């Protein structure tokens, strides 16, 4: 049994506090996890809801047989891109050390991530009187000036994947620490901007046929025009055909303190693949807001506005990982919106109401009462969103988005703004 001591280093705590112990065991290829709250944490903060699969009571708790690591820790894990980097590093090390390649578990991914850039407010120790794991200054994330080298390294990694070859170690070493703490499938890394703020840098892919980063930046600009609280973004030239997107980390304060983040997937107790096909949707998030959020009315209105915006720009990749919350002493509140980009799909990933995921603002208007929103207010919100989005083409032109790309997505905006 391996054990990690879990600490909350939340921005509203005077100092980091022990939350509990995370245990991991692998028997005959099957991974199991346990968690035990610290009594002092339960005494002071036992009313806070951290994860749908961990109850607020003393004693050992275990993951379900068909589940991986507890949801609240899963949010700190890398997804496809970060796991690719860690898996390829393990293959290279195994070759150098002349040993079999280990199959990495979620526990391995968790302890392999740089402490400084890990998402959210949890930190981990192997001994209570020891240092936090992976907090060495040598692992600090690179400056923005390294962006071109990081993009070049990510493209070399992609190239080696296409050729079914191991990448050169030098490319991995550039990316493995800044690039493994982040979710998502696309190439990315953490970088430090000129203000000393940590940002997510999303790189263009070798396989892109349009400027994905520039369109995501446009989406965030439009979101703010539409009254959606969204992550702050910018774009930077990479020396390649397309731009990199920079998104300021909203789980960090200006002073660098950690805000605790959890995805809607974690807080609702769901897994990847839970979406409209499984009968899940935005009303599940409504239920969570009613039960566990502070400023309930404000969060409900903001959620409704975000659904309207997603429909308006065709952002159909709106699954539960792409909705999140930040923890305050009074409960959860919606995090700034993130990962928004137009698509040509006419259906959202999540159900808009109890029956359909068809992306139509009239469907959303007719469903306003399911969001606890009155009809008049719903009309007002939707009209504000449409007003914020209607000048999309002039903003896209100002950003330098190619006309051929605008022609592709014009049908999406025309459909929602009719």
What positions do the PLM features span?
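Phosphate/dinucleotide-binding and metal-coordinating scaffold of catalytic cores
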Residues: 1-320, 324-418
């Amino acid at each position: 049994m391996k054990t990690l001591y879990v600490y909350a280093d939340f921005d509203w705590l005077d100092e980091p506090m022990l939350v509990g112990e995370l245990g991991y065991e692998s028997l005959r290829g099957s991974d199991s996890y346990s968690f035990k709250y610290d009594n002092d944490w339960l005494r002071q903060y036992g009313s806070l809801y951290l994860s749908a699969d961990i109850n607020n009571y003393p004693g050992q708790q275990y993951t379900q047989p068909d589940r991986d690591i507890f949801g609240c820790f899963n949010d700190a894990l890398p997804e496809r891109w970060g796991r690719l980097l860690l898996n390829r590093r393990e293959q290279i090390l195994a070759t150098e050390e002349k040993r079999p390649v280990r199959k990495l578990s979620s526990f391995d991914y968790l302890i392999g991530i740089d402490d400084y850039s890990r998402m959210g407010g949890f930190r981990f120790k192997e001994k209570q009187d020891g240092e936090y794991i992976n907090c060495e200054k040598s692992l600090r994330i690179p400056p923005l000036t390294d962006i071109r080298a990081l993009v070049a390294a990510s493209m070399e990694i992609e190239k080696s994947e296409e050729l079914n070859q191991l990448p050169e170690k030098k490319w991995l070493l550039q990316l493995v620490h800044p690039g493994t703490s982040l979710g998502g499938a696309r190439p990315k890394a953490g970088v430090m901007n000129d203000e000393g703020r940590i940002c997510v840098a999303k790189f263009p892919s070798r396989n892109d046929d349009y400027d994905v980063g520039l369109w995501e930046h446009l989406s965030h600009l439009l979101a703010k025009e539409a009254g959606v609280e969204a992550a702050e973004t910018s774009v930077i030239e990479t020396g390649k055909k397309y731009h990199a997107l920079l998104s300021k980390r909203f789980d960090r304060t200006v002073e660098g303190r950690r805000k605790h983040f959890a995805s809607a997937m974690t807080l609702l107790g769901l897994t990847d693949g839970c979406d409209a096909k499984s009968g899940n949707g935005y009303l599940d998030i409504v239920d969570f807001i009613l039960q566990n959020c502070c400023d309930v009315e404000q969060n409900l209105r903001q959620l409704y506005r975000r659904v309207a915006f997603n429909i308006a720009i065709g952002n159909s990749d709106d699954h539960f990982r792409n909705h999140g919350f930040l923890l305050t002493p009074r409960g959860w509140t919606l995090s700034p919106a993130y990962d928004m980009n137009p698509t040509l799909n006419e259906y959202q990933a999540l159900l808009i109401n109890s029956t359909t995921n068809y992306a139509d603002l009239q469907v959303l208007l007719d469903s306003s009462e399911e969001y606890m929103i009155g009809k008049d207010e719903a009309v007002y919100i939707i009209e504000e969103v449409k007003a914020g989005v209607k000048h999309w083409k002039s903003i896209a032109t100002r950003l330098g988005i190619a006309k051929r790309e605008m022609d592709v997505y014009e049908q999406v905006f025309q459909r929602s703004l009719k």
